[in-house]
Amino acid sequence: MTTATEKQTAKGRKILLTIVGIPIVIILLSTALYFMVDTKIVDLGTVNNGTLITPPLRFSELPLLGLDGQVQDYGKPEPKWSYVVFGGAECIDDCERMLYLTRQTHIALAKKMPRVQRLYVSTEGSVSDYLQGQMKQHYADSLVATVDNTALQKMFSTSGIDPLQKNSFFVVDHNGWLMMVYQADDLQQHSLNSLGKLVLKDMRRLLK
């Protein structure tokens, strides 16, 4: 009799825990979904043309340095969305084409252009004189910074993505979350044009 009562009591407790637990789980999932939609990591009812990085990476915590060696605060003077290209002291071939692509898609944002900035990040502690000249001549409104490669690789370690993979650039939201990557199939102009249109489609939606 006692055993049957104990079993019934245990069963009742499990049912009670289930009843109490389900709303908690729903609340937690709803909160997570709300955060992802609110920060535009997820846009319900739409499909991103870039590859979402989940969970997003805290780019704003990377120890970025300006070319003068001073700490560069990602969020200053004001928070903006960013196109980020990672490379070395030199940026040629596929790397330079990503600078070109991000510049063109940035310009094409028109009225929304001021809400986005472009950033080139060298993992080699500096950039060459040649690259500095190229940046001034062709990409004067792009920011340039350096970062320790070990710190960069550590940030990406859980994502399964190589930050230095060819033909690619990243999108960081205005809150400092690195949340999307685009990669061109090749460097042919028609391929870059096609990718640029997809980037614009995503960015115009994200910047609403």
Give the location of each predicted region.
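N-terminal "domain-start" segment that seeds a small globular fold
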Residues: 25-28, 38-75
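N-terminal Lys/Arg-rich, disordered targeting/topogenic segments
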Residues: 1-11
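Structural beta-sheet core signal
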Residues: 83-85, 118-121, 171
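Structural microenvironment flanking redox-active thiols in thiol-disulfide oxidoreductases
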Residues: 97-138
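Hydrophobic membrane-insertion alpha-helices, especially the h-region
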Residues: 14-35
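Thiol-/selenol-based redox modules, centered on thioredoxin-like
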Residues: 166-208
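Short active-site neighborhood of thiol/selenol oxidoreductases, capturing the structured segment around
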Residues: 76-102
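Short, internal strand/loop/helix patches
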Residues: 119, 134-166
